[in-house]
Amino acid sequence: MKLSDFDYYLPEELIAQTPAEPRDSSRLMVLNRKEKTIEHRIFRDIVEYLKPGDLLVRNITKVIPARLYGVKETGARVEILLLEKISEGVWEALVKPGSKVKKGTKIILSEGVEVICKDYSQQGARILEFNCSDDKLFELGNAPLPPYIKNQKVPFERYQTVYSKETGSVAAPTAGLHFTEELLERLRNKGLEFADLILHVGLGTFRPVKVEDIREHKMHSERYYVPAETVKKIRETRKNKGRIIAVGTTSVRTLETIARLPNQESYHGKTDIFIYPPFEFKLTDAIITNFHLPKSTLLMLVAAFAGKDFILEAYNTAVKMKYRFFSLGDACFIY
């Protein structure tokens, strides 16, 4: 398949710049893959589409305040975006302007807090060594909001899910942003089960596909962990004929990664799984997700799940009906 097969027209004003308030008041497009039907609801109505015995699989990663600002000894300003922790005090990061940060460059973040560029990494990234603890670093950091969000004053807690626990992502698993504690309680009371996993979202989420033949695209690898309790719940749900419902594409990618590995009690590692049509989903029965960028790997994933033509029809309908798109936008439930 070609990259151009996954394009659609999106007016810029439909890119959400602020989150819905309350979280579960965003709109919800419900897509039935078998019947090819489209319904328009509010996110909290999702309770009506979920059944006792369904398993909701959530990514409990927590976003770090990964965007930092500093100055070189020359006085030139530098922006740093943390990508992944390598060891104590050492991070892989993107720097702007990259041409100004070479091996040995020192950057001052605040009084007594500085960083030295130790080496070059893949695709323009740098290996940086900080002289402070992570806690101090995160005190200085800002929310790493995606570049298409012009409103950089979105409160940091609104870019975290209410169930986030494990620090390590540079972008939110945004499908989870729609859930409130009250909505989760309603789902529990209805007899739904919850299972948690971790995939620390890296910058690959926003990396554009630059090749027309999508099979040539290489995904950035991301670290994941699926605990034994979650593996057990997944197997029990399968045995009892319940549905496995992935909250977000990060949960989908983790589930479909472990589905291709030998049976284990728990799973951890790095995944660079790239899901595009045609693809056999082995563990995912339904997906809760946001509306994704044209020509993005995430759009390809939902196209693989629901069929490319049906997804593009749904997206064109969403544009006509002025749904809000991307990270802070509205949601889709695809089953």
From Swiss-Prot:
Enzyme Commission code: 2.4.99.17
UniProt keywords, alphabetically: Cytoplasm, Queuosine biosynthesis, S-adenosyl-L-methionine, Transferase
Gene3D superfamilies, per database record: QueA-like (3.40.1780.10)
Any one biological process term the GO annotation gives: tRNA wobble guanine modification
Example of a GO cellular component annotation carried by this entry: cytoplasm
Compartment(s): Cytoplasm
Pathway where it operates: tRNA modification; tRNA-queuosine biosynthesis
Catalytic activity: 7-aminomethyl-7-carbaguanosine(34) in tRNA + S-adenosyl-L-methionine = epoxyqueuosine(34) in tRNA + adenine + L-methionine + 2 H(+)
Molecular functions per Gene Ontology: S-adenosylmethionine:tRNA ribosyltransferase-isomerase activity
Entry function: Transfers and isomerizes the ribose moiety from AdoMet to the 7-aminomethyl group of 7-deazaguanine (preQ1-tRNA) to give epoxyqueuosine (oQ-tRNA).
Xref: NCBIfam families: PRK00147.1, queA
Family assignment from sequence similarity: Belongs to the QueA family.
Oligomer status and interactors: Monomer.
Designated name of the protein: S-adenosylmethionine:tRNA ribosyltransferase-isomerase
Lineage: Bacteria, Thermotogati, Thermotogota, Thermotogae, Thermotogales
